[in-house]
Amino acid sequence: MNIVKTEIDGVLIIEPRLFRDSRGYFFESFSEREFEEKVSPILGHSVHFCQDNESMSSYGVMRGLHFQRPPYTQSKLVRCVKGRVLDVAVDIRKDSPTYGKHVAVELTEDNHIQFFIPKGFAHGFAVLSETAVFQYKCDNFYHPEADGGISILDDSLGIDWKIPTEHANLSEKDTKHAKLKDFDSPFDINVDLYK
């Protein structure tokens, strides 16, 4: 796999190595050994995934921007196995030089790209195709009492979701998240979330 660093430290794009022939293609979607060898040195620590999730959504669905509060913080490794999504990570670590900045990447069933979102970031995506199947790995189990979010429609974040507002389809919970300016982040750049 090929690792692409983004403009925000720790947020990574992972391009798998595909083997194609007349029958189709094959690739390893995840190898713990290769992830440890190639990603952990960049991050400065290991990541051990413990839970896999999958969602199916229709065009215009926007999920996010989600995170889990300490001590149940999560890193995620995400991909789109059917359709097309715009996936976004927003830095919400206090005192970070990139606080409030984001990285956006289009994940599709054709490009097979994976996106690594570290702890201390809010994560969300928008469905750009008729339907999309989205899979993600987490390095901590889901804890509903630690669930948190910021508004996915906060204009101050400067995210072009590539969906007209009238087509945006959000859960009731996601419509109630605070905007970044009204948000008191539980994360701090000076606290190592991986200890």
Predicted regions and their residues:
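Conserved metal-binding segment of the jelly-roll/cupin
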Residues: 107-131
